[in-house]
Amino acid sequence: TSVAIVPEIYAKTPTKAKVIAYKDESDLARFCGVNLDDIAFKTPFLLDALLALAVEKILFDRCDVALLNTFVIEANKLEELTAKMGRTWVNDTKATNIDASIQAVKRYKDHFMHLILGGDDKGVSMDELFENLKGLKVKIYAIGSNSEKLMNLAAKFNIPALKCEILQNAVNEIAKELKTSEIALLS
């Protein structure tokens, strides 16, 4: 028998497979019979972890959270570093596209974020990222060849921003302001 694990919006798509639909991570956790707090991963990796457990549940009728938690995420993928004075810096330099940056922002949406953005966007529209930043507590530090474009978008979306040109300038500016309850995110 074939099985399809799909987001709820696709549950009614015609298929011969048995459909397991989920709305969010909580739905998958219920299907797997696990507690979300027992899983070592956070957004955006939490959904992937739960999908892996769901496949294990389907194939072997078990969900080994302890084994799952031994998996190590590659360096520079939302890698949290706590510096002296208890301040959190997040290295997400593997986020090479808009979607990855959006997921990083979602992970820290409940914190004030000092967000370093920039580089060569290769002409890709950044509007979707800025749409996701609206309403969040965030300040942008624009670096790289597209820093002027980022500053214009920040103004358009009414998001505080500082043009820093290079990474070291952005880090220095953030270091002056970063509080222990806030996040410095390089994405």
Q: What positions do the PLM features span?
A:
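Short internal beta-strands
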Residues: 2-8, 114-117, 136-145
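Short, aromatic/basic amphipathic alpha-helical patches
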Residues: 10-19, 151-157
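Nucleotide phosphate-binding/pyrophosphate-handling subdomain across enzymes
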Residues: 35-137
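Flexible active-site lid/hinge loop adjacent to a nucleotide/diphosphate
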Residues: 1-13, 21, 25-28, 36
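Short beta-strands and strand-loop turn motifs
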Residues: 7, 185-187
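Acidic-glycine-rich active-site phosphate/pyrophosphate-binding loop
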Residues: 18-35, 74-80
